[in-house]
């Protein structure tokens, strides 16, 4: 299953990392080790964010993915399952059937048929 790893890096730790001349090499090693499909870096709420798209086959892979970010970056780490458009197209018909099975008459009147 495809997951988004979002690592929020505290300012102090981030400042130290970017001053390390080996930082980019270490980051690239992590990306290669976890076989990230994609890696993106951005700012959010004043923090440095690193995000990676990875394939997780089983839950026991999570520590391998997260611990280097906790230990080496002091990051706040979140893991979120994500879908491609093809995944969404595949799952949506059954999701609509399931959602409609829980729908009440009041909800149908308020929201109409979708």
Regions from the PLM with identified roles:
Residues 1-114:
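Conserved, structured core segments of small domains
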């Amino acid at each position: 299953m495809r997951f988004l790893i979002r690592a929020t890096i505290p300012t102090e730790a981030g400042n130290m990392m970017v001053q390390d001349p080996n930082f980019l090499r270490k980051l690239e090693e992590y990306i290669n080790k976890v076989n990230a499909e994609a890696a993106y870096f951005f700012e959010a709420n004043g923090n440095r964010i690193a995000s990676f798209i990875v394939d997780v086959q089983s839950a026991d892979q999570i520590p391998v993915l997260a611990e280097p970010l906790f230990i080496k970056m002091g990051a706040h780490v979140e893991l979120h399952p994500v879908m491609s458009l093809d995944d969404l197209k595949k799952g949506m018909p059954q999701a609509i059937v399931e959602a409609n099975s829980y729908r009440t008459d009041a909800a149908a009147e308020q929201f109409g048929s979708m």
